[in-house]
Amino acid sequence: MQNTPKSLRLHLALLGRVNAGKSSFLNLVTGQEAAITSEVAGTTTDVVEKTQELLPIGPVVWLDTAGLGDDTVLGDKRLAKTQKVLDRADVVILVCEGNKFGSEEQEIAAQAEARNLPLIKVYNKADLYDCPDDGIKVVATDKSSRDAVLTQIKAALIKVVPDEVINTPTLLGDLVPSHSVIVMITPIDKEAPKGRMILPQVQALRDALDFDNIVVMVKENEYAAALQKLKVLPDLVVCDSQVVDQMVAQTPPAVKCTTFSILFARLKGDLLKMAEGAAAISKLKDGDKVLIAEACTHHAIEDDIGKVKIPNWLRQKTGCRLQIDNVSGCGFPNNLSKYALVVQCGGCVKNRREILSRINQCEQVGVPITNYGICISELKGVLQRVLSPFEQELAEYLRSRQ
């Protein structure tokens, strides 16, 4: 489980005022010096991430944040980063200094409630204060208490963590019965990592194998030959979005087909909203602004999918003079209302809550959002075909195009 991608781990955000003992608590539960601790207020400046296995919960990633109530020059910037963490947190761990529960703690609790996030209270320095009984009492500097604290944390998490967070939904296991034949088309292009497959392909392969399916992986130029060599037609074909038009042209009409991006739109976000958002492409007009959001911060190549290919395809398909902005990493603009469309990447490195948060932010200001692969399928004129395995989403897409 140590190799579980961060995007599939339960995200636990440690929040609290400065010097409440968040970093000391992190060091205690992980059994390592994962974060620097000091008596000086504001020691933690950026978000510190630490992965851990918490059986029977499973793989988690702790997010240690800068404390609230920092009056230094950089305090506001640290606060902004801390609040951004809430967009990707599955659970908030509120660390209090003893029984102190003032405006800072109330603000964290209010923000967690507004986002419908479970909140667990941890009262640190319990040896110095008379702490309430509605949380976990700890002395974060007492290393001998680690086992007892872990037991309490796991018990608290089991009570509040949604079942779908612990039991990650399937990528494609519900689309075909076990022992089906699945063909995956995986181009090896300039953006492919050397000597390995990209994460979405690896996860889809593992998911198919978990459901006892037979998987054939080919490059796009070998797909037609693979179909001829198979004794029976495949039950499902999944391809990289960049070759979706070729795949659709070569796939018999009776065979289900889709893309890795569509599978991830369903796993990580809201496929219904993403399909609805794709219908907005045909309604773009001259001068409209489009935001293209990349979740990771890879080095863009000359033919980059987000910075070059999709912008070019959008302009070619619509025939419009579009203004296109790009953002990458954790950054997501606050002024989304100026955009006519947001195109989000597949989010393979993000957890589901963060992608849902972005969808929700767009929905609040009435801006349609889709993802790279769904956008590409629409631009290639084959989205209806690759949405066909998903009846409800296909119906919403067709309705939105009217």
Language-model features and meaning:
Residues 65, 95-100, 117-148, 185-193, ...:
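G-domain G4 guanine-recognition motif of GTPases
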Residues 266-319, 325-331, 336:
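Redox- and metal-dependent alpha/beta enzyme cores, enriched for Fe-S-associated oxidoreductases
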Residues 1-76, 80, 84-87, 91:
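Conserved G1/Walker A P-loop phosphate-binding module
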Residues 89, 234, 339:
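An anion/phosphate-binding loop that grips the pyrophosphate of nucleotide cofactors and donors
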Residues 50-58, 63, 73-143, 170-174, ...:
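Conserved C-terminal guanine-recognition region of P-loop GTPase G domains, centered on the G4
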Residues 114-174, 181-183, 212-221, 257-260, ...:
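Canonical P-loop GTPase G-domain recognition
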Residues 309, 334-336, 340-402:
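C-terminal functional extensions of proteins
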Residues 21-24, 152-153, 184, 190-208, ...:
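Short, charged N-terminal beta->alpha structural module
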